Curated annotation (Swiss-Prot):
Record-linked Pfam families: PMP22_Claudin
Protein's job: Probably involved in cell proliferation and cell-cell interactions.
Record keywords, A-Z: Glycoprotein, Membrane, Transmembrane, Transmembrane helix
Glycosylation sites: 49, 56
Protein's name according to its UniProt entry: Epithelial membrane protein 3
Organism: Bos taurus (Bovine)
Listed InterPro entries: EMP_3, PMP-22/EMP/MP20-like, PMP22/EMP/MP20/Claudin, PMP22_EMP_MP20
Coiled coil: none
UniProt keyword Repeat, yes or no: no
Localisation per UniProt entry: Membrane
Cellular component annotations (GO), alphabetically ordered: plasma membrane
């Protein structure tokens, strides 16, 4: 049982790390010439002084929706981890982790919706940018976090506390 709890906790921490990097790092979209866009800033690499020059992204409504959903997924994932720890130490033997599982399932839905909106509306979000480019690694990390959060939520729902 302790090995299972360790694996579930490690999976949850991995999902948290993936969501933090996907939400806060600077590569949701990469353009030719070392320019990248994330959910918050448009960054260009300045090779003269070897720094990133960043400016705020556009006020596109779809981008705002993606920002909100990714922050919501982070909040829900943190909440579910705290809830898991609380239930682990206070719940009686034989209890199920339904609340934790439900929070993780909501996390996976929020990540899925945010990444899907970004994928579908990328042309509108990037309308004032030059053509070309591709999705960055943060976008891929969001897609990796989705099935992991979904699996984690299902595991939590079926997990029963034992002594």
């Amino acid at each position: 049982m302790s090995l299972l709890l360790l694996v579930v906790s490690a999976l949850h921490i991995l999902i948290l790390i993936l969501l933090f990097v996907a939400t806060l790092d600077k590569s949701w979209w990469t353009l030719p010439g070392k320019e990248s866009l994330n959910l918050w800033y448009d960054c260009t690499w300045n090779s003269d002084n070897k720094t990133w020059a960043c400016s705020n992204v556009s006020e596109n409504g779809w981008l705002k929706a993606v920002q909100v959903l990714m922050v919501l997924s982070l909040i829900l994932c943190c909440l579910s981890f705290i809830l898991f720890m609380f239930q682990l130490y206070t719940m009686r033997r034989g209890g199920l982790f339904y609340a934790t599982g439900f929070c993780q399932l909501c996390t996976s839905v929020a990540v899925f919706t945010g990444a899907l909106i970004y994928a579908i509306h990328a042309e509108e979000i990037l309308a004032d940018r030059p053509s070309g480019g591709s999705f960055g690694y943060c976008f891929a990390l969001a897609w990796v976090a989705f099935p992991l959060a979904l699996a984690s939520g299902i595991i939590y729902i079926h997990l029963r506390k034992r002594e």
